[in-house]
Every structure is written in C-alpha cells, then in structure tokens.
Design a protein with these regions (language model features):
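N-terminal carbohydrate-binding accessory modules
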Residues: 23, 195-250, 650
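Accessory beta-strand-rich segments of carbohydrate-active enzymes
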Residues: 28, 34-39, 78, 83-190, ...
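Accessory carbohydrate-binding/adhesion or oligomerization-edge regions at the termini
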Residues: 16-72, 146, 150-159, 178-185, ...
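Catalytic beta-strand/loop cores that center a nucleophilic Ser/Cys/Thr
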Residues: 403-419, 695, 712-813, 830-864
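Beta-strand-rich binding/interaction modules
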Residues: 103, 115-117, 196-198, 565-604, ...
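Short alpha-beta junction capping motif
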Residues: 664-709, 796-798, 802, 822
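Substrate-binding/catalytic cleft of secreted carbohydrate-active enzymes
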Residues: 257-527
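Aromatic-rich peripheral "rim/lid" segments of glycoside hydrolase catalytic domains that contact
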Residues: 344, 512-577, 850-853
Length: 864
C-alpha cells in the first residue's frame, strides 16, 4: 500500500510539472503547411497547399529539385536540393491564461527569416549561429492566429558565407532550408542553465607562458577539426544524445578539444561537452578576407560573435573563440573585434583566426594563443617556422618535414614555437601555439561505405571513384588499396602527433582529421569515416597510445639500425594528466620473434615533457634483417582501463657493405641496351632500373596531402611542383623478393630510401590481370596502375624492372638490404615471371603514352 501511495504521488507530481510546462510553452513541432517560393511571389497569408514536418528541412522532407544521378565528385549529392525562399505556415492557439503575459517565438536554428502573424510582418532575423527569438506579445493575443515563417537560404547573409562557412557549405552540412531543433512559443525567454559539476578540464582554465593550464595543472590540447559532417541529415544534430555519441567517440580516441571550423555548434553540443570535459572553440561563420570596408560583412560577423558569446558563453566547455578560418585582410579590424568580444566575455581566450594569413604574419598583439601551421614566413626549402609535419607541395617544399627528412623520432617544432611572440616584444611574451589542421594524410576510400548513406545525402562521388577504378581494371584491389593506404596513414598520423608531443613549448594540435571530410574534392583523410565509424585501421586503444594525457615517447635518430651499431635512443614522457608519475616504473621491452631485451626506468614527478632515461641495446646477435617492436609501458597507471603504453616498429640489418659479388651474377642496367638485350636472348636475367620518363610519377613517401585535385590546381596556379599524388605501396610480404627485407603489405619507415629514389611507372597498358610485385597506389582522380617493381619473361630471358635507383638507396642500411634482397631474388630459382611479353611489346609499354582522364580544376578560398 505504501509503495502504491508513493507511486501515485510521483505520478501526480510528474503530471503537475508537465502541465506547468505546457502552460508556459507551446511545442510547434509537427505538420506545417508549406510552399516553395522560387519567384518570390507568395504573400503572407496566401494558402499553402503542401505540407512539411518540422523540425526538419526541405531535404529531409524531399522537397525541391530532384537529382536522380550525378557525376559530382566535389562533395556528396543532395537528391533533393533547394535554394531560395520557402514558406512554413500553421495555426496556433494562444490559451486564455496567457493573457497579459509576454509571448516569444523560439526557433533554435534556421536561416534568415521573416515572421508573419495573421498576414502582418512582425519580425525578421538573420541569426544563423544561435536561436532566433521574437517577442510576439502584441500580435499573439489569446485565441487563434495564423503563424507564417518565410525562410530564405539564398539571401539574407553576406555573399561570402555561401561558399566558405561550414554553416552554409555544400561540402558538409549543406545549405539547407528549414527549421531544426526546438520550435516553440513560450511565455518567457529561455534561461541559460549552467553545468552542475565543473569538469577538471575547465577549472581555472588559463595561460601561463606558452601553455594552457586547468585545475592548477599543465594540459595539452589534443584536438580535432569539426566541419559539421552529419551525412544522414545534411544538417547539424540538435539533440544532446547525438552529441554525447559524437563526443563520446572523440573522447574514446583521446580527444579533449574541438575546433569548429567557421561555424558554431548548438546548445546540445556544449551540454555534452560540459559532461565529457572537452574544450570547445567555436568560430565566427566565416572564411575569407576580413574587409574593414565591407560594412555589411563586418556588422554581420560582429553581431554573430556577440550572439555566440551571450548564448553559449555560460557553458564551462566554451573556453576559446576564433574569428574564423584562414582569414586575411585587416589585422587592425581583427584586433578591434577581439577587444569588443573580451568586454562581453572576459573569461574566454581569443585568437584572430585559425591559421590567419596561413601563419605568415606571425603573432600579433591581442592574441591569447596562436593556431597555425607556421610561425611567420620561411625561405622555400626551410622548415624552421613549421608547426605541423605535412603540407601540400604548394605550401611547403617537398610537402613538409615528414616526407622530406630521413625518418626519425627526434623531429619537433621547437624552432617554430620559439618565434611565437608579438612583434616588438620579447621571448618572455611568447603565446601558446596550437598546430593547425595537423596531418591530412589521405586514405583510399572504402566503397562498402556507400550503403551507409540512407539519408538526405548520397555518395555519387564514391560511385564515380569506384567506376573509375573498375574502368582501370583494379576494382578487385579496392579493399587492399584502402587497407594499405590506411595503415600507412595511421603511422603518419602517429608521427605528426608525436612531433607535437616532443615539442616542449607546443600547446596542442587540431587534427584534420579523425573523421573523413566528404567535400572539397572528397578528402578521405580520416581514421574514421564520415559517420565517425571505424575504418578497421586501428582500435581506440591503439590510437590512444599516442593520443592520451600521458604518452611515453621514443626519441631516436632513426627507425632502422645496424647490428654493428646497436640501438641508442632516449625515452621521453609527455605528462599532461594532472597526476604525478613520481616513483612509477616505465617498463620497456624490445621483441622480435621473442624477447630481445628489457629494462625499467623510474619516473620523476615532472609535468609536461621530460626525458626519462637512455636506451643502449646490443643488436650484434642479429645476422639477418629483422623487424622488431619496442614497447614502452608505465605501470600502475590507468586510462580507459589500461596502462599508458606506446609501441614502435623498428628494424635491424647486418652491416653489409659489398654487394659486388651478387651484382656480378646478373646484368644490372639503367637502359635496355644491346648488352641487356643480348643477355635476355641468351636466357639470362636482367635487372633494369630505368631513368624517369613522362610515363612516371615521382616518389612520394607519405600518402598524398588532403586532396590531389585541389592542390594540383593550386600548385599549377602558383607555378609550384605538383605532388606525385600517390598513397603508398601495396605488396605481398610473403613474396620471395622480401626474404631479406621484412615488410608489411603497406609502406613503413624502412621504405624511405627506396621510395624517395623512385619514379613509379604507369602500367595502364598492361593486361587487366597484370599486377606489379610492388604496386604504388594512385589517387582517386588518376587511377593509374603504378609499378615500383615488376617482372616479365621475355623470350628465354627474365627481366626484373625496378623503378628506383637502388644504388642511391644503398647509402642507408635498409636501402642496401633491399638492394641485396632484390639481387638475391633475381639470382634464385624463385625468380620465375609468369607474364610473357615480347621485347617489342615491352619497349612499347615503356614508351607508349597512356590515356589520361581530365582532372577538373578545384580552387581553395585561402590565398596561397
């Protein structure tokens, strides 16, 4: 009886609260009358013959212009698209008990609007970053009324926003028309609700020197870029649960910071971020020239900034704010905006814009921190100003440090960070530096993703790319291309992130990206797909090895060692956990097929980056090339249920110096001259290492940056070298050519000397089933069948073609080992090419141009 009484009381209380809420709010979600107004001829009060469901968009309701098929590859396709005016209309009944009370219309997110009550214009707004709220007290008296809302996604904001801001761009959330989120009438303005419990990441968030601090401890921003990618709805999610899911995935991958590229997320995002402890940096909805003479633009952006700060500023997760993406224009006007915004929200930290002037202008007074890819300008071919490891070939010589320098785990960005102080001030005034849009390493797309697009966007771009690959005769390799390029991309992400962590005065990074970017030419740069789902490249735990509050780091001048020299390296620890590691043990193990060596290092209590100890490991027992793994693990620590740990692939090679005996057993040549032809006719073996021709592409070590089509255009426009555009190698590790050169199916660090000395050959004119021994994966625009190493039976002779200068590569132990392994293969019984070709046909293959598809231009907004 007591339980029943309690249940009844609870039910009555809930009904009372619900009734009280209904007495203050009228939910306007549901069916509305609707009409498209293409010619702007509809007048308020005109009967509308169609219907639409709100919250929603014309896309989600299948209104507008239908596209059955598209060859568009710049971004995803909207099967139903519309740009212009649209009318939404319904009857509302204001209760009698609202008499004498204020009445507000609340539209949580929409585009520029005009509001009509009973056919009369009562308000308008072009607030796009925050809710539109209208005081309709005079118009909405008790009784029935006709409420009409005209939404215009074709005008009403500065023209620059339509092709730039992620609040509008077709590249991600699209330029939708509609009303999303809460739609209601209310007798009071929405109240700002602060989080009950403040996450430690937000407490006393401040700057000291070149670092961020929270809760009294040094922190490091492990950030990602967010471009409003919601492929099922084509618009941002407005509910907290969706944002918990999204931010929960970010958190599981070690992310504690998100930069919202040229847009601001809704209330639900900040609520979820408050819970997860993720530091948010929204931006003004702008990417372009900060033109102080454009009063319309400046007034609009200033208003949007004020709205963002006043609407979401109470959230503890909202700690940082930027004026937009890669701005140029009036620096004085940028400083003026920041001064004004500080008066509104002095608790926030501000920067002029993410990567403003592409970093060339350096730090200016008024910036609290500097998000950039470089700190000031550098001479072409220098890297001392850089704050990330990869660039386009249009923006940095050879695509940046990772592609250019011999692989090591010592590189960092200390030189660049030391330049981060305002003009005319001293080093002591240096500001925190955050690496802008770090990584951007491409992965070949996974075409199985196509079936996941069941919403308002369809991946005709992926279908076009799949069709191109099928036409090139390599569709059967799509999965392997995806995995090989993706697994190599994963190692490149690790390297770029660790370069940041190895920089003592670096404050953080913002990845581009953990997630694929489906626009701007289709940039498949994510470790996760556009849906934030795994691509099967790594687990969350593996990723957290190098993206966590504590990361043990190997510091060595190489990945490849000789048995004579041994392994000499240092161990560092990046500790930004807010916890002392004093007295804890870092345990290291070097393993091959079994344990090689192990040891322990006691750790101090130091915060930030510190050197923990030295490693000197004897490798003299290795008489054959061997791949090893070094594991670093900190005992008695826990992050997501496991201790902080990190692993590194390393290689050891015998100190061979003389390959002349093997070379004497085979004809080695760089041209198919009379001597080589004679040897083939005699049934001998020939190793051909031809020079580069116009049928070759360059040797790119990393996977291509961002998107080949776009940066090909930019490079050509700026008269810069175009990137080779490739995505790493694909091979069979069990092939006998690798008996003396351990490898995986994909590129890894030991391939550097060979690939940098290479010029892969276009083999499009070979048979459909022909596959090189070592294939180079081409990008989605060209789809060439590229060969690094391939073989033919020519008459009685056998020909192995290597499109790399192995003599040049032999200056490194791993290059020498590869050359030796190739020579051992060509002189063994394993060398038995299955593809027969005549000498004449081979010569044609090496000289006949291939059919090249036209690659359309694709420009960027930023002025390179």
């Amino acid at each position: 009886m007591k339980k029943l009484t309690t249940l009844l009381l609870m039910t009555v209380l809930c009904l009372h609260v619900q009734a009280e809420d209904q007495s203050k709010h009228i939910n306007l979600s549901g069916t509305w009358q609707f009409a498209l107004d293409r010619q702007a001829t509809i007048k308020a009060g005109d009967p509308l013959t169609d219907t639409i469901l709100l919250p929603g968009t014309t896309d989600t309701n299948k209104k507008g212009d239908f596209t059955a098929k598209s060859e568009e590859t710049t971004f995803l396709t909207r099967p139903w698209s519309y740009k212009g005016r649209a009318w939404y209309q319904r009857e509302v009944v204001i209760p009698a008990n609202w008499k004498g009370k204020a009445v507000y219309l609340f539209l949580e997110r929409t585009k520029p609007t005009e509001i009509y009550v009973d056919g009369k214009l009562v308000g308008s707004s072009n607030d796009i970053s925050t809710p539109q709220v209208f005081n309709l007290t005079k118009s909405l008296t008790p009784g029935k009324h006709q409420l009409s809302i005209m939404v215009d996604n074709g005008s009403g904001v500065p023209k620059q926003l339509y092709e730039s801001s992620h609040a509008y761009t077709e590249s991600t959330q699209t330029n939708w028309n509609g009303i999303i989120g809460r739609i209601e009438l209310s007798t009071s303005l929405p109240a700002a609700t602060a989080a009950k419990d403040i996450h430690p990441n937000f407490k006393d968030f401040c700057i000291k020197g070149q670092h961020f601090y929270a809760n009294g401890h040094l922190i490091f921003l492990r950030g990602k870029h967010d471009a409003c990618v919601w492929p099922l709805t084509g618009h941002v999610a407005m509910d907290v649960e969706s944002w918990r899911d999204y931010l929960g995935t970010c958190d599981a991958y070690g992310i504690n910071h998100i930069r919202f590229h040229s847009w601001c997320p809704p209330e639900a995002a900040f609520v979820a971020a408050d819970e997860y402890g993720i530091i948010m940096q929204p931006e003004l909805p702008f990417w372009g020239s900060f033109d102080e003479k454009d009063d319309t633009l400046m007034t609009f952006l200033h208003k949007e900034g004020e709205n963002i700060l006043r609407t979401y500023g109470h959230h503890p997760s909202f700690r940082m704010f930027a004026l937009g993406n890669e701005l140029w224009g009036s620096i004085d006007k940028m400083a003026e905006f920041i001064d004004d915004f500080r008066k509104i929200a002095p608790d926030k930290l501000y920067t002029f814009g993410s990567n403003y002037y592409l970093g060339y202008q350096g730090v200016k007074k008024g910036m609290d921190y500097f998000t950039t890819c470089r700190v000031g300008g550098e001479g072409w071919g220098n890297y001392n100003t850089h704050t990330r490891g990869s660039f386009s070939f249009a923006d940095a010589d050879d695509g940046g440090m990772i592609n250019h320098f011999y692989p090591n785990t010592m590189m960092n960005f200390e030189e660049g960070c030391k330049l981060a102080f305002p003009e005319g001030s001293s080093w002591t005034k240096a500001v925190p530096v955050i690496s802008h849009e770090t990584a951007q390493f491409q992965t070949y797309p996974d075409f199985d993703e196509i079936k996941k697009y069941t919403g308002v966007l369809y991946p005709y771009n992926m279908k076009v790319f799949r069709s191109r690959l099928e036409k090139a005769g390599m569709l059967d390799q799509a999965k392997d291309f995806h995995m090989a390029s993706g697994l190599w991309s994963l190692q490149l992400y690790k390297q770029d992130i660790e370069m940041n962590l190895r920089t003592k005065n670096m404050a953080g990074f913002q990845l581009l990206d953990l997630q694929d970017y489906p626009g701007q030419g289709s940039a498949y740069v994510g470790i996760l797909d556009a849906f934030m789902d795994s691509k099967g490249l790594c687990t969350e735990r593996e990723w957290r090895q190098w993206c966590a509050p504590v990361v043990p780091l190997l510091v060595a001048d190489r990945f490849c060692f000789t048995n004579e020299d041994g392994l000499h390296a240092w161990v560092q620890v990046a500790n930004y956990s807010g916890q002392s590691l004093n007295g804890k043990t870092l345990r290291w193990e070097l393993t091959g097929t079994s344990l090689v060596s192990s040891g322990e290092i006691k750790l101090p209590s130091t915060e930030g980056l510190f050197t923990a100890g030295e490693l000197k490991i004897d490798l003299s027992a290795f008489t054959n090339p061997t791949q090893l793994q070094l594991s670093l693990c900190i005992d008695d620590t826990e992050y997501f249920g496991a201790p902080y740990h990190n692993t590194y692939d390393l290689w050891v090679y015998p100190s061979w110096s003389d390959l002349s005996k093997l070379e004497s057993m085979v004809t080695v040549t760089n041209k198919l001259d009379e001597v080589a032809i004679s040897q083939l006719e005699k049934g001998k073996s020939v190793l051909l290492m031809p020079d580069s021709t116009n049928l070759c592409v360059g040797g790119l070590f990393t996977t291509d940056y961002w998107n080949f089509r776009m940066f090909k255009t930019i490079s050509e426009n700026n008269k810069k070298q175009v990137s080779p555009g490739t995505l790493g190698i694909l091979t069979d590790p069990k092939h006998p050519i690798f008996k003396g050169f351990p490898t995986q199916m994909h590129t890894n660090w030991q391939w550097f000397p060979v690939i940098k000395a290479s010029h892969p050959m276009m083999l499009d004119n070979t048979g459909k089933d022909f596959r090189p021994i070592v294939q180079v994966i081409d990008n989605i625009e060209r789809n060439h069948k590229l060969g690094l190493i391939f073989e033919f039976q020519i008459g009685k002779g056998k020909l192995l073609v290597c499109m790399a200068d192995l003599e040049a590569a032999s200056s490194y132990p791993e290059g020498r080992a590869f050359y030796r392994s190739v020579l051992q293969y060509i002189t063994s019984e394993d060398f038995a090419p299955k593809t027969h070709i005549t000498l004449e046909d081979f010569q044609k293959l090496m000289t006949t141009p291939v059919v090249e598809g036209k690659i359309g231009e694709l420009n960027n907004i930023s002025p390179y």
